[in-house]
């Protein structure tokens, strides 16, 4: 019962946040410089008749009050109608559908690559605590966090195009961006896995398993793997949302026709309907992914369910992630 209430509460939070994002997007577009009528007519206002300008404003609903315009905006949004591009005259929804797949492909590929690399490295670092393997992994993780993604991307582009003379679309528009985005994400996951595993290795469950004569592989798989990975789920939600936002820079650096590239191109041409669509897509995606991550954590983590069932234990039942800094 408590789980259902908590899930409903998180879903309500998501709806409220999406509503706020939509309203803020509407306000920001209204405060942005320039007149959409000028952009649509593609002419200087002095060369256009007053009747033509008023007719265009009536068609766009610009003569209505802001409250009425907002109401129409929200109503159209609920029907997935984001208007038409000033430049191409295509529906914004269709444009987003054309550009979104490559962005989502790069983001989810980055997530998979990061998990496949960081979880084993985090386990190795914890099992070889304070040995040279652990130190090397920690140094590489620190460097990956310290260097900006665009700087890593520039270095990779220079190595591949100038030093290796490789000209490949798949390499430059998919493999290199995934590597660039994965490095920073891997570093955070490695540190989290390492810290959680170091703490769990000192737990009573592990000590009891060792006393029963269980080997280290059995203990790792049956006793440690699940509680080590569970705290990663909220981090993945945050990271995946950040990846979508981070693609704005990476897609323009690698010339990838995704949402980030579309957003920058629309800002340059002041194509406001497309800008609104891109901002809403990124905002909605981040909120929905984080909500899904919270719900998965709630369903899979027994400590979360215990805290919901007995709120008095909330301060007395520490989560794994709270003690992670001790071994960082």
Swiss-Prot record:
Q: How does it sit in the membrane?
A: Multi-pass membrane protein
> What is one cellular component GO term in this UniProt entry?
plasma membrane
Q: Does the keyword Transmembrane apply?
A: yes
Q: Give each disulfide bond as a residue pair.
A: none
Gene3D superfamilies assigned to the protein according to its UniProt record, in alphabetical order: MetI-like
- A Pfam family cross-referenced in the UniProt record is BPD_transp_1
Q: Tell me the compartments it is located in.
A: Cell membrane
The GO molecular function terms of this record are: nickel cation transmembrane transporter activity
**Domain spans labelled ABC transmembrane type-1:** 100-297
Q: Keyword set for this entry?
A: Cell membrane, Ion transport, Membrane, Nickel, Nickel transport, Transmembrane, Transmembrane helix, Transport
Transmembrane spans = 11-31, 104-124, 139-159, 170-190, 229-249, 279-299
Function noted in UniProt: Part of the ABC transporter complex NikABCDE (Opp2) involved in nickel import. Probably responsible for the translocation of the substrate across the membrane.
Q: Which family does it belong to?
A: Belongs to the binding-protein-dependent transport system permease family. OppBC subfamily.
The record describes its quaternary structure and partners as: The complex is composed of two ATP-binding proteins (NikD and NikE), two transmembrane proteins (NikB and NikC) and a solute-binding protein (NikA).
- Supply the name of the protein: Nickel import system permease protein NikB
Q: Gene for this protein?
A: nikB
